[in-house]
Amino acid sequence: MASREEVLALQAEVAQREEELNSLKQKLASALLAEQEPQPERLVPVSPLPPKAALSRDEILRYSRQLVLPELGVHGQLRLGTACVLIVGCGGLGCPLAQYLAAAGVGRLGLVDYDVVEMSNLARQVLHGEALAGQAKAFSAAASLRRLNSAVECVPYTQALTPATALDLVRRYDVVADCSDNVPTRYLVNDACVLAGRPLVSASALRFEGQITVYHYDGGPCYRCIFPQPPPAETVTNCADGGVLGVVTGVLGCLQALEVLKIAAGLGPSYSGSLLLFDALRGHFRSIRLRSRRLDCAACGERPTVTDLLDYEAFCGSSATDKCRSLQLLSPEERVSVTDYKRLLDSGAFHLLLDVRPQVEVDICRLPHALHIPLKHLERRDAESLKLLKEAIWEEKQGTQEGAAVPIYVICKLGNDSQKAVKILQSLSAAQELDPLTVRDVVGGLMAWAAKIDGTFPQY
């Protein structure tokens, strides 16, 4: 059995090694940061890539396994070497897409992403690493791709794609890949591709499912042909809200890379006019035919009305971001900050905290004093859940003055579902299915609690 002195010595050595490791990590981050910023950001590449007459000896060796494919051959590889591909979004889809395009020898990759690397990205965004957390995704991706294939020109764009810049940028590239995660950007990229005459390889992934198609190519429909009007903003779920398995984005990103390579090499796409659906849980792929190009399409029809790029956030009624949306369903009087709720909790005042997140999120983390009833149970007026809520209210009421209402505070992850729950509880109280209630939601939810109240509380 080790003596106390040996334990202390080992603890001291571990602390010293951890300090050395942290120092090495800082040096690595500095080195990677220096590598990824060799040039200032340019709005557009300065010149087209020159044509290539032949492959070098090194290129023949590097691409030998795909060169011997009769469908590709030397001619196809030469076309790849002069192709310029614009990738909108360097996240779960854009990372594997860019990785395989660089490996295949595509001449230039434009990398558009205004966001920075976060730890929550690393489970699926495989070009980024821990050492570059907080750095621009476009620069991080460019640095990784240069290490993979130094012959590929990588052009990072760290500003968000906007109606003022999109068309000029798209015109400088041969093929565009939409790897975004929001509806306004999808319409923006589609309209820019139609106006510039560029094919658009589009994919999306959510939870265990994904889909891919090619728009505006070889007489096929554009995005507006299929979706003339955007969906209601409150019906749209992104990866931050609904979650996604990293492997699913990897599969769809690889399929995007395949379509881009076939277009760039002159082989033609598989999914122009069709949509490939992927169900990861069942392991199924299914292809469905899309409607043909609409002659009355606002973008690509015979008499288009979209002749310039417009305000897509206003058109869609939502922000051009993949971040979680912040709903505003309640008045300020019906909401409290996490700081005010913490003050109430510390005072010992009688109240009930209702957590309306799904069970899978409660399994990740929770406040121990909260009653858990998922929002879906409230939406369908689940009898058992309402009984549980009534019992909890009654128990809390025993400590108050007779007849006093027990205030209910509703919390969720971000403060969106909690507002919906407040509305439901108010309607139940108005319909006398519950006793008269004072209900408020906690602004920002548990993520605000983690950021402002308890730094040890898990964020997800």
From Swiss-Prot:
Broad class of the protein's primary localization: cytoplasm
Residue positions binding Zn(2+): C222, C225, C297, C300
Region (Interaction with NFS1): 158-238
Cysteine disulfide links: C316-C324
UniProt keywords, alphabetically: ATP-binding, Cytoplasm, Disulfide bond, Metal-binding, Molybdenum cofactor biosynthesis, Multifunctional enzyme, Nucleotide-binding, Nucleotidyltransferase, Transferase, tRNA processing, Zinc
Keyword Transferase: yes
A single GO molecular function term of this UniProt record: URM1 activating enzyme activity
Biological role: Plays a central role in 2-thiolation of mcm(5)S(2)U at tRNA wobble positions of cytosolic tRNA(Lys), tRNA(Glu) and tRNA(Gln). Also essential during biosynthesis of the molybdenum cofactor. Acts by mediating the C-terminal thiocarboxylation of sulfur carriers URM1 and MOCS2A. Its N-terminus first activates URM1 and MOCS2A as acyl-adenylates (-COAMP), then the persulfide sulfur on the catalytic cysteine is transferred to URM1 and MOCS2A to form thiocarboxylation (-COSH) of their C-terminus.
Designated name of the protein: Adenylyltransferase and sulfurtransferase MOCS3
